[in-house]
Amino acid sequence: MNPKIIFLDAVREHNPLIHNITNLVSAHFTANGLLALGASPMMAESPDEMAELATISSAVVLNLGTPSDEKVSAMLAAGMAANQAGVPVVLDPVAVGASHLRQKTVATLTQNIQFAAIRGNAGELAYLADVQWASKGVDAGQGSGNLAEIAQKVAQKFNTIAVLSGEHDFVANHDRVMKLSNGVALFPKVTATGCLLSAIVGAFLAVAPRELAFQAACEACTVYAIAGELAAVGLQATQSGTFAVRLLDALAAIDATQTEQLMKAEWII
């Protein structure tokens, strides 16, 4: 990873339109997080307008949180149209191991759409990598697999950038894995923080040339994690509500220099 943060300012300058087909739990928080960062959110879900909207979007983020037949149809239409338009598509396979419906949906999406990035927790990416893991609904659950290897297996299997988020984040492509160690324990205490990260990955990919997509994904994770650290200063473990509001403020205030000074990154592979 380049130690210089080069895409945060680009997000704010270009105000990319990020089309999210997301879940009812996270839509509001995701939209506000993108606005705070400097991107522009769109949360449309009708299959009938997906082809048109893909041509005006800067990135498309597909989130499996609350699937339905209509939403899955919209995801397919949006993702395929975005591929045709050269617009990056991000997949967030929420709780993919929890039900046959989610597993079937992810299989359909990955067979028909080329994803620029797949972002999930350890349990979700372990399922995609065919690694045994005891997931707990939308939570990561418990497992003993090598997280860097899981991320890289997903990257290689789907020819994508894999972002495995958790206490440490792992960003992988077909031959490299970066470990990112910023962040705070309050993140999992607020619903939709993972969903927002997927959308922020989309925003950074939207302003990055394809050959620098790996760098952009690493930057997205780092900026978000450090914003969380700044938001959590002085807070107790019981102040998750305050943290959620302060996280939006931190996303609006964080700058590249601050991020460069605080980031913790190392190559694993």
From Swiss-Prot:
Domain of life where this protein originates: Bacteria
Q: Which residues bind substrate?
A: M43, A192
Q: Which SUPFAM superfamilies match?
A: Ribokinase-like (SSF53613)
Q: In which pathway does it act?
A: Cofactor biosynthesis; thiamine diphosphate biosynthesis; 4-methyl-5-(2-phosphoethyl)-thiazole from 5-(2-hydroxyethyl)-4-methylthiazole: step 1/1
Q: Which cofactor does it need?
A: Mg(2+)
Gene3D superfamilies the record matches: 3.40.1190.20
Instruction: Say if the entry is tagged with keyword Nucleus.
Output: no
Entry's Pfam families?
A: HK
Which biological process annotations from GO are given for this protein? thiamine biosynthetic process; thiamine diphosphate biosynthetic process
What are the binding positions for ATP in this chain?
R119, S165
Segment forming the signal sequence:
none
GO MF entries: ATP binding; hydroxyethylthiazole kinase activity; magnesium ion binding
**What is catalyzed by this enzyme?**
5-(2-hydroxyethyl)-4-methylthiazole + ATP = 4-methyl-5-(2-phosphooxyethyl)-thiazole + ADP + H(+)
Q: List the disulfide bonds.
A: none
Q: Which keywords does this Swiss-Prot/TrEMBL entry list? A: ATP-binding, Kinase, Magnesium, Metal-binding, Nucleotide-binding, Thiamine biosynthesis, Transferase
Query: What family does the Swiss-Prot or TrEMBL record give for this protein?
Result: Belongs to the Thz kinase family.
What does it do? Catalyzes the phosphorylation of the hydroxyl group of 4-methyl-5-beta-hydroxyethylthiazole (THZ).
Q: What is this protein called?
A: Hydroxyethylthiazole kinase
Q: Which organism is it from?
A: Glaesserella parasuis serovar 5 (strain SH0165) (Haemophilus parasuis)
Which lineage?
Answer: Bacteria, Pseudomonadati, Pseudomonadota, Gammaproteobacteria, Pasteurellales
Gene this chain is encoded by:
thiM
